From Swiss-Prot:
PANTHER family: GRPE PROTEIN (PTHR21237), GRPE PROTEIN HOMOLOG, MITOCHONDRIAL (PTHR21237:SF23). Keywords: Chaperone, Cytoplasm, Stress response. The lineage of its organism: Bacteria, Bacillati, Mycoplasmatota, Mycoplasmoidales, Mycoplasmoidaceae. GO terms for cellular component: cytoplasm. Belongs to the GrpE family. Pfam families: GrpE (PF01025). One of its GO terms (biological process) is protein folding. The gene is grpE. This is Protein GrpE. It is found in: Cytoplasm. GO terms for molecular function: adenyl-nucleotide exchange factor activity; protein homodimerization activity; protein-folding chaperone binding; unfolded protein binding. Homodimer. InterPro entries: GrpE, GrpE_coiled_coil, GrpE_head. Participates actively in the response to hyperosmotic and heat shock by preventing the aggregation of stress-denatured proteins, in association with DnaK and GrpE. It is the nucleotide exchange factor for DnaK and may function as a thermosensor. Unfolded proteins bind initially to DnaJ; upon interaction with the DnaJ-bound protein, DnaK hydrolyzes its bound ATP, resulting in the formation of a stable complex. GrpE releases ADP from DnaK; ATP binding to DnaK triggers the release of the substrate protein, thus completing the reaction cycle. SUPFAM superfamilies: Coiled-coil domain of nucleotide exchange factor GrpE, Head domain of nucleotide exchange factor GrpE.
Length: 217
């Protein structure tokens, strides 16, 4: 810009030399106009230069802000992906457990008939102790009953062990009737029908008679 100003000034001097003798006032007016124009150009140039310098100073800050934003976005994206994957894993695990549970307890729907057969054999064995004619079949009944019991156990089915004198437990027992007994109140007097569990789930409550606890010996 300084070189341009110098060139214009030289031009002004040349013009002044050529026409100074004829029209000094006109030369002075032109000179003022040119000088004002040069001054305005110089101001604009300096302003643009200042703007450029300010922009250059801001570039590192903008670059840093851009890098920080990129890192933040990458971190947010990674966290979102991890959360989505964790949710998918949770759903898959839940579905897997539900499927395993369904398979585990699917046999429960088919157990009514085998359990009823076992009930009949247990009744027959109890009568065998009283009836000599039936007692001859005890060995055969016992073998069949044992075979059924082993098959049930192999499939996760176990008989709930209940003995007379035990406390009545509504979680595994169903009370058929309250009866007079020498046993304390709420004690099991007799088991009418055995209860069973499939793994840890009760699939049939034991039917029992429960003591009123009011009979004196």
């Amino acid at each position: 810009m300084c070189e341009k100003s110098q060139t214009i000034k030289e031009l002004l001097n040349a013009i002044r030399t050529l026409v100074v003798k004829n029209n000094k006032a006109k030369v002075s007016m032109i000179e003022k106009e040119l000088l004002a124009f040069v001054s305005e150009l110089d101001k604009k140039f300096k302003q643009q230069l200042n703007n450029f310098n300010e922009l250059q100073q801001k570039i590192p800050l903008l670059q840093k802000a851009n890098e920080e934003f990129a890192l933040k976005f990458e971190r947010m994206q990674r966290e979102a992906q991890n959360q989505i994957q964790a949710k998918l894993d949770e759903l898959n695990l839940k579905n897997k457990k539900e499927l395993e549970q369904a398979k585990k307890y699917a046999i429960a729907k088919t157990l009514d008939q085998p359990l009823n057969i076992i009930d009949q054999f247990e009744i027959a064995l109890s009568y065998a102790q009283k009836d000599p004619q039936v007692k001859n079949y005890t060995t055969g009944f016992t073998m069949v009953l044992d075979a059924f019991s082993r098959w049930l156990e192999a499939n996760g089915v176990t008989k709930i062990k209940i003995e007379p004198g035990m406390e009545f437990d509504e979680k595994i027992m169903s009370a058929l009737e309250l009866v007079d007994s020498n046993l304390a109140k709420n004690k099991v007097v007799r088991v009418s029908k055995s209860g069973y569990k499939l793994y840890d789930k009760v699939i049939r409550f034991a039917s029992v008679f429960v003591s009123k606890g009011n009979k004196k010996s």
